[in-house]
Amino acid sequence: MLKVEIPFPPSMNRLWRATKGGGVYRSPEYVKWKEAASWAIAAQCRAGRIKGPFKLTMLVVPPDKRHRDLDNLFKASLDALAAAGVIANDRHCRWIEARWVEDGAPCTLILDDLGGKHE
């Protein structure tokens, strides 16, 4: 089991921006968040990497009173885990469990190795 705490993830709706020519690019907000989250993850997970299938549990503290979709936070969190090298690829995620919590870190990620390929 690996446990990391990261900044509150951006919503899926905030990850990408469209150009006038029809292209897409990562939003500056997402780029900044992903770099900060990847550094935080790498600092906390020096001893572990998961190469194969895994379960992700997310415990998220809402930053304010706005209504949010919890499922919009998965992609950015998984991308940060992959960028930090903690998981080989987010396609190996076999099970996601997530819930809002009252207190704690903005976002706590708990990874359970389902394949026994933990280094």
Show the residue positions of the predicted features.
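Acidic, proline/glycine-enriched N-terminal capping motif
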Residues: 1-119
